[in-house]
Amino acid sequence: MDQREILQKFLDEAQSKKITKEEFANEFLKLKRQSTKYKADKTYPTTVAEKPKNIKKNRYKDILPYDYSRVELSLITSDEDSSYINANFIKGVYGPKAYIATQGPLSTTLLDFWRMIWEYSVLIIVMACMEYEMGKKKCERYWAEPGEMQLEFGPFSVSCEAEKRKSDYIIRTLKVKFNSETRTIYQFHYKNWPDHDVPSSIDPILELIWDVRCYQEDDSVPICIHCSAGCGRTGVICAIDYTWMLLKDGIIPENFSVFSLIREMRTQRPSLVQTQEQYELVYNAVLELFKRQMDVIRDKHSGTESQAKHCIPEKNHTLQADSYSPNLPKSTTKAAKMMNQQRTKMEIKESSSFDFRTSEISAKEELVLHPAKSSTSFDFLELNYSFDKNADTTMKWQTKAFPIVGEPLQKHQSLDLGSLLFEGCSNSKPVNAAGRYFNSKVPITRTKSTPFELIQQRETKEVDSKENFSYLESQPHDSCFVEMQAQKVMHVSSAELNYSLPYDSKHQIRNASNVKHHDSSALGVYSYIPLVENPYFSSWPPSGTSSKMSLDLPEKQDGTVFPSSLLPTSSTSLFSYYNSHDSLSLNSPTNISSLLNQESAVLATAPRIDDEIPPPLPVRTPESFIVVEEAGEFSPNVPKSLSSAVKVKIGTSLEWGGTSEPKKFDDSVILRPSKSVKLRSPKSELHQDRSSPPPPLPERTLESFFLADEDCMQAQSIETYSTSYPDTMENSTSSKQTLKTPGKSFTRSKSLKILRNMKKSICNSCPPNKPAESVQSNNSSSFLNFGFANRFSKPKGPRNPPPTWNI
């Protein structure tokens, strides 16, 4: 399987994963479980980091370096120096120590940090955090600012020689002096990466890694990468750069996967790529790189290579002239179009300087760039990962050399990433002894480490060389088409970065806005019931919404029961959300209008419930109707403040799952009796003035009669509610409690307490009424059985009028 098929296979798999978002969550959950298992089983011990003298050197107690891969310091500058620092080596494509992943230095480890940088000859430091984040110190400042006095860290002196600001990061040129030796170290400080989160765009990260590889093109010395803990953001940069190196050299294995890569990296330092969002960021970055490379391959196979004959000599002459320059790259312009134009002008200008030397160089490089026939002999084995293998404390780094050291690493012709995304790096200076440039134009003689093995190379060595020479004679120079494809790829706009955004992502974004709108409105309505579980707060999947919920939601938008301040601004968004998933029973305007008409009909009849819904009495007299009408006379006098308060309490008890129309009717029934009772209880004298009493009883005073009549009317109202709507009382807990409270307050003992607090005159007249009641009980026991004492325990309406009414 060639590189084109491998890339296409990965793109197809990634597209399916983006459609089913759960796969990302499942994969990251496996990574977390793996780390938990390693920690519980002590698969990779951290005994050195747990020593008492080293505990204070760890920023976080749960991010400790594994013993077998930790960075050991041997450069001793004082008696207090030790060999410990919270840092690990991370394997690269061509070496076991390609990266140093470390935490942000503490105030007590600044000297250790610079000892590590100096001992391992680090040229590049990548900082992926801020000095302060969320009000907390994330990293001590180990660098100097431009124009600032040099900083002293033990025997090390650090000063800033220059600073280059990009849109999202800063490149600082630091001069570090130790004893009498001075070195130049470059710090890439990424400033727009939030902690435990991801940047909003992939482009700045790819640009950062691009610039890093312009300054250091290979793994001859490790690149130091750190954030605050040295695991989350640090792991993202390591994983992207590792994959980019594979892609550039054309050695993506058939079974390549981001999951396997990060799982292997987590065996070298704990919690690399710390969150699921960071995991998806790595996936998206790799996906973008693969898409760009596939565009180059498609254009290359369309026959555009015939347009270039002398582009390789011209380009290589530029490399020949610039490769010995002591200065670092001057053009790493972000605008790809301008860079391509400058590159074209440079090639036209230098076309006259073509000589035999450059043609000879290009002829040699054709051996590397065009192994057309011999490329089929390269079969890549599985990633050499030992995921579940137990590691000893004496575990050693192992490297695997090529079968013949010094033999060029042959690369596929279509994977020249130097002309693809690193055109600004043409003047990078060589680092390794073999003169391997970052744009991969010369043979690679580096020994190979664990990630991959090339098989059948011994058997095909002689055949490959012959085929390459024969191919060189039969084919013209064709790297100019790479140049042209580079121009095409470098024009990738930000819209192309979102090319991989499937329907699911956009769909999810739309759903998220609607869900947010629904939650805000639901919170306003149900914010008064923290102790009652409500089905609307549960997560509702897009395709599993029931019709009960969809019936309740539109009714809440009407505003007839709840206060207007609690209503959402628009009710159409909720309907559009359900309609988009075909799960709403109300998916037509006629259904909505019919529902509103039903509500208006119920509300129109609600104010006349006293007349239309009498208690079911076997024999009813006209006087009993007159008593109920008197009870309803006081309801218009209820203050608005009390009404709104009662409404809120009723509205929070919407817990049952049936249709909402009976609930609207119940709410209005609850409001009117409870309001009228509360206001009439302390004002019985007003009640006497405004209503005509029934025929006087022979042995009762007017005051005692009105107390009994109040309770009678209260019981009448309670009976109306309880007999008409038993289901609502069973299913609404808070409504029952609201109803019981005023009911109990109007027993004889509690009514006397209220009257004692409000008016002493009424309180004084209450005790004489009790003998009158006992007398009345002898004459009219049937009336007392249905009134006052039994009304609130067994709410029943009056069956017969008092015998003294002379009807």
From Swiss-Prot:
UniProt modified residues of type Phosphoserine: 35, 449, 635, 684, 692
Listed SMART domains: PTPc (SM00194), PTPc_motif (SM00404)
MF GO annotations: kinase binding; non-membrane spanning protein tyrosine phosphatase activity; phosphatase activity; protein tyrosine phosphatase activity; SH3 domain binding; ubiquitin protein ligase binding
Assigned GO CC terms: cytoplasm; cytoplasmic side of plasma membrane; cytosol; nucleus; perinuclear region of cytoplasm
A Pfam family it matches: Y_phosphatase
GO BP annotations, alphabetical order: autophagy; cellular response to muramyl dipeptide; lipid metabolic process; lipopolysaccharide-mediated signaling pathway; negative regulation of autophagy; negative regulation of gene expression; negative regulation of interleukin-6 production; negative regulation of interleukin-8 production
SUPFAM superfamilies: (Phosphotyrosine protein) phosphatases II
Lipid metabolism is among the record's keywords: yes
Keyword Hydrolase belongs to the record: yes
Variant or mutagenesis effect after changing residue 620 to W: Risk factor for T1D; risk factor for RA; risk factor for SLE; risk factor for VTLG; probable protective factor against Crohn disease; also found in patients with Graves disease, Hashimoto thyroiditis and Addison disease; affects CSK kinase binding; alters B cell receptor signaling and memory B cell proliferation
Annotated phenotype, changing residue 263 to Q: Probable protective factor against SLE; severely reduces phosphatase activity
Domain Tyrosine-protein phosphatase: 24-289
EC number: 3.1.3.48
Residues annotated for substrate binding in this entry: 227-233, 274
Subcellular localization(s) per the UniProt record: Cytoplasm
Active site residues per record: 227
Region Disordered: start-end pairs: 676-700, 724-746
UniProt function note: Acts as a negative regulator of T-cell receptor (TCR) signaling by direct dephosphorylation of the Src family kinases LCK and FYN, ITAMs of the TCRz/CD3 complex, as well as ZAP70, VAV, VCP and other key signaling molecules. Associates with and probably dephosphorylates CBL. Dephosphorylates LCK at its activating 'Tyr-394' residue. Dephosphorylates ZAP70 at its activating 'Tyr-493' residue. Dephosphorylates the immune system activator SKAP2. Positively regulates toll-like receptor (TLR)-induced type 1 interferon production. Promotes host antiviral responses mediated by type 1 interferon.
Family per similarity comment: Belongs to the protein-tyrosine phosphatase family. Non-receptor class 4 subfamily.
Oligomer and partners: Interacts with CSK. Interacts with LPXN. Interacts with CBL. Interacts with TRAF3 (via MATH domain); the interaction promotes TRAF3 polyubiquitination.
Involvement in disorder: Systemic lupus erythematosus: A chronic, relapsing, inflammatory, and often febrile multisystemic disorder of connective tissue, characterized principally by involvement of the skin, joints, kidneys and serosal membranes. It is of unknown etiology, but is thought to represent a failure of the regulatory mechanisms of the autoimmune system. The disease is marked by a wide range of system dysfunctions, an elevated erythrocyte sedimentation rate, and the formation of LE cells in the blood or bone marrow. Type 1 diabetes mellitus: A multifactorial disorder of glucose homeostasis that is characterized by susceptibility to ketoacidosis in the absence of insulin therapy. Clinical features are polydipsia, polyphagia and polyuria which result from hyperglycemia-induced osmotic diuresis and secondary thirst. These derangements result in long-term complications that affect the eyes, kidneys, nerves, and blood vessels.
Protein name from the UniProt record: Tyrosine-protein phosphatase non-receptor type 22
Organism in which the protein naturally occurs: Homo sapiens
